[in-house]
Amino acid sequence: MKKTFITALACILVAGCGSKSTVDPSLWAPAPIPIQTPWAEEVSPANAHPEYPRPQMVREKWASLNGLWNYAVTAVDAEKPAAWDGQILVPFCIESSLSGVGRRVSAEEALWYHTTFKVPSSWRKQRVMLNFDAVDWAAEVYVNDQLVGHHTGGYTAFSFDVTPYLKKRGDQKLELRVVDGTNNGEQPCGKQVTNPNGIWYTPVTGIWQSVWIEPVRSAAVTSYLAVPDVDASSVDVTVFADGAAEGDEVEIWLREGGVGYNPEKPEGAATVAFAAVAPGKPVRLTVAEPKLWSPESPFLYELEIRLKQGKKVVDEVRGYTALRKSSEVVDSEGHKRMGLNNEPYFQYGPLDQGWWPDGLYTAPTDEALKFDLVKTKEFGYNMIRKHIKIEPARWYYWCDVLGIVVWQDMPSIGGTHGGRWEMWKWASPEDDRELTETAKGTYYKEWGEIIAQLRNEPCIVAWVPFNEAWSQFNTEKAVEFTRSCDPTRLINSASGGNSFPVGDIFDSHNYPNPAMKFTSEGLQIDVLGEYGGIGWPVEGHLWQTDKNWGYIEYKSGEDVLKQYTVYAGQLKDIIAQGVSAAVYTQTTDVEGEVNGLMTYDRKIVKMDVERLRAVNQDVIASMKK
């Protein structure tokens, strides 16, 4: 009998247990911090992010390596340590409370990790892939004292085939050496700085997303690309495979259930399209009665992919896709608008930085990760600008499932935040920064990898190569590069940065009130990429006792809501003049910033939710189509 997807997921979660060597959980406790989220108390070495980490490409068999590892901090040029400093809870970065360590690592130091794991006997005669979902920043990976490979970049997943390095049986030794320059001017790091203050936050070093292993045969699917074409009611799918031979074939099913793809209730999914094609060859799957994805109706189609050699299935993965189009459209009054599925669609949502008091870059649990998104929907928004950070795959999965459109920023290169910045005029080439050749190369490498990793996510509707003028260089070339990586989404060349007539979107920032002091005058889609920042430091829920700030500050939720409502009225005025989207700062307080819709610990929502929702829905409805 064919397994339903929910049954397969249950098997996957069971299979993910038990391969990590056992440790004494009494050796771990969270490092002290001023505040923590409600989910921090649920975290333990036995349950550190146990959920399947890659919902876009699910295999039945896998094993999590999250849990307690040994760690040591040495001089950057030191050999592997002879003894370990203590234990660290993976996947939480060493600076975080939930790591159990809570210490900084400088650019003159190296962070070493050590653990052991067992390969299940049922995986014999298969290759074993070792997967790191994110390590900040430069990593060297060793298995059984042999160098397996290197990786640089703090935001993308990487994998190694470790089969040649494994012993035939028993414990396998895994070690990792990490060096992180943070804001040294050579690498993307977003809001991380070595000296946190104001809008700059605690640095993140080392492993900060899940580590896991999975078995694959000599021929296996490595990735796929699913490109929706709403106008043709179809999805173009290309499946890539490693080790495939001439004559091998991939079979692709596109399925829908009664309410679309839902891993909680996948029973009854019906095939709406099928194709068989050689690996690496694109094929079009046409849907007779298409259902489009939107925040109001986030309909997802299930993808099932099988790699076959003759009649034998050698690999099978499952994922999902959606029929969704992001484009420029013109409304009835001649204004260029952001379009969703060929209709003008006002996009309104918070600036979301994705920081946590207890995990820093890493949410304490998957439920916590989902919580911010559920609240965003409850508040009446339909969009999030993901601000100079890349999230774990499950964050985008929840946006896809819940129905939230996302603008995805590229994390800025640290140490490059000064220089010329004149937002309210057209810029010239001399306004672009001069970065080192190393920094430029790193930017293009990491941005290209980020886009490739996230291209299949229906929720993402716009790429943002630069924020303000931070590390903004050769804007025209950066936009061309972004377009070459993905021609199907809108490009916001520099949100609130130096403006060039390239890309699709002209983006201005104004604090605290919503205003457009300069527009593209019809050349591009005009949006307000940041405004607001209404602050309220809620006693008992603060990261620090002083030096907290917002762009303006109040002492009660009622006062915050009154000011927010005033700004909403002003926002409607500029929407009528052609503004097509707006981003409010911000989802939560972050460290010393107290301008969140919620406190940093997520325990207090600062405004009455029903009234906030009504205001936001009124703003969205005000744009004429």
Regions found by a protein language model. Name each.
Residues K167-D171, F240-D331:
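Extended acidic/polar, glycine-enriched regions
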